[in-house]
Regions:
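Short, flexible, solvent-exposed loop/turn segments with mixed acidic/basic and small polar residues
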Residues: 4-5, 30-33, 113-115
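Bacterial N-terminal signal peptides
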Residues: 5-15
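Vicinal oxygen chelate
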Residues: 22-35, 38-48, 66-68, 91-139, 161-166, ...
């Protein structure tokens, strides 16, 4: 009898632990102040701005701002290790009004970019917003490298799909989609 009670107690404890692990943390109070850093955007270095825009603007639907020429003293040269002889252009893209300038493209011309082989160290994760199959089909048509899909489990949105691909410059893009899509985060 004691063994059965102990086993029942362990099973209840394990069940509670599993349920807790699958339960998202409570939403922070609206009045709680955030004192951390604010994420602004991700930047991809590309070799051809117009070609990159066929992916980001025409296929994924992001809205580009103006394309500007970066000068010789651009901070991008230092942080991205771009030689002075390279020409650079810059463009930010928005994902609707609530995600303004959430991605940047930096075109680098006049130097060869290194091939991205081995471990991929960064990637954009994007809600496909019900268009995952169409986007992946178009990525294949564009000749991009497409990885296989995977089931993506969520405690609150059901089972979804995630699928990644590489742009022409080897930059990683991972799409995901749930049956109960989440709204975009406000920026």
């Amino acid at each position: 009898m004691k063994i059965a009670a102990v086993m029942l107690s362990l099973a209840i404890g394990l069940s509670s632990s599993l349920a807790a692990a699958q339960t998202p943390p409570p939403a922070p109070s609206v009045t709680q102040d955030y004192e951390g850093a604010y994420y602004k955007r991700q930047l991809y270095v590309v070799t051809d701005m117009e070609r990159a825009l066929t992916l980001w603007r025409d296929l994924l639907g992001l809205q580009p701002g103006d394309i500007t020429t970066s000068g010789p003293n651009s901070y991008s040269r230092e942080v991205f290790n771009i030689p002075a002889r390279a020409a650079m252009r810059f463009c930010t893209l928005s994902a609707g009004p609530n995600q303004a300038r959430t991605l940047a493209l930096l075109e680098v011309k006049g130097v060869r970019l290194p091939r991205k082989t081995g471990i991929r160290t960064t990637g954009a994760v994007i809600n496909a917003n019900g268009r995952l199959d169409a986007i992946i089909a178009s990525a294949r048509t564009m000749g991009l490298t497409v990885m296989g899909p995977r089931v993506l489990e969520s405690a609150t949105q059901g089972n979804g799909i995630e699928q990644g691909f590489l742009d022409w410059d080897g930059n990683v893009i991972v799409l995901y989609q749930f049956p109960n899509a989440d709204a975009p985060s406000r920026r």
